């Protein structure tokens, strides 16, 4: 069983590495980070779809059955995601592209997945955490691509930012709090699994503070821009009215 899990994780790692190399060859004029973010975007879409299917259709429901035995589909998805996080953590360390908070998030994710796979249980809530963590990931990558291509300061960029902040606050913080509560009050999950859940939620709040600061600064900037434009238009209307007299 352990050998099969290791092989699945290694195959996943090899798959993500191969996808990254393929993107690098197809997009030779782009940076390494561009191609890595394409891999991240692909993983985000794939993991959202798979984890949503597990949580909402295949089951079991994470809010009522935390600590339950892993299903075969959960194991496959966790191995797929484990390979990705190992790839991305190695990439971030090699290129020194991320700070301690993101590295801590990836490390906790890897440890959480490994624990669930080794125990053979708690895949239900780990899968739910995966869904909550990845649901904003595609938006984050789209935002980066918009900035790189010079299209960020537009209506599309504003929509992406709004959806990102709203989803992060509502799902990762709001729904995440409910999931953590269910995890803590349930007698089934192991105590160290609960500690890992608390650690992941603390990391989410650290991200949340940074996101709220960004949202506040952008809102203030947008407000001042609107006020300035409104004042200029008002002045032009007044000047035009005076000239007619």
From Swiss-Prot:
The chain crosses the membrane at residues 1-21, 38-58, 75-95, 99-119, 162-182, 191-211. Keywords: Membrane, Transmembrane, Transmembrane helix. The keyword Secreted does not apply. Coiled coil: none annotated. Residues 29-204 form the TLC domain. Pfam families: TRAM_LAG1_CLN8 (PF03798). It is a multi-pass membrane protein. It is found in: Membrane. InterPro entries: TLC-dom, TLCD5. GO terms for cellular component: membrane. Its main location: membrane. Belongs to the TLCD5 family. This is TLC domain-containing protein 5. It comes from Bos taurus (Bovine). The lineage of its organism: Eukaryota, Metazoa, Chordata, Craniata, Vertebrata. The gene is TLCD5.
């Amino acid at each position: 069983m352990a050998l099969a899990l290791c092989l699945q994780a290694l195959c996943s790692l090899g798959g993500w590495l191969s996808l990254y190399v393929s993107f690098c060859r197809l997009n030779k004029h782009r940076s390494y980070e561009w191609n890595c973010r394409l891999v991240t975007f692909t993983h985000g879409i794939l993991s959202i779809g798979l984890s949503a299917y597990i949580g909402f259709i295949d089951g079991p429901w994470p809010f009522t059955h935390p600590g339950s035995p892993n299903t075969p589909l959960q194991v496959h998805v966790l191995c797929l995601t484990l390979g990705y996080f190992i790839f991305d953590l190695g990439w971030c360390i090699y290129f020194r592209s991320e700070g301690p908070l993101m590295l801590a998030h990836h490390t906790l994710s890897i440890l959480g997945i490994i624990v669930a796979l080794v125990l053979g249980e708690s895949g239900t809530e780990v899968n739910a955490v995966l869904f909550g963590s990845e649901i904003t990931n595609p938006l984050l990558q789209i935002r980066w691509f918009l900035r790189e291509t010079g299209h960020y300061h537009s209506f599309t960029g504003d929509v992406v930012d709004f959806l990102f902040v709203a989803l992060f606050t509502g799902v990762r913080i709001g729904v995440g709090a409910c999931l953590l509560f269910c995890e803590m009050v349930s007698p089934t999950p192991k105590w160290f699994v609960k500690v890992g859940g608390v650690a992941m939620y603390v990391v989410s709040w650290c991200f949340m503070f940074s996101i709220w600061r960004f949202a506040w600064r952008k809102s203030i900037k947008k407000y001042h821009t609107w006020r300035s434009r409104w004042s200029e238009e008002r002045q032009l209307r007044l000047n035009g009215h005076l000239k007619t007299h």
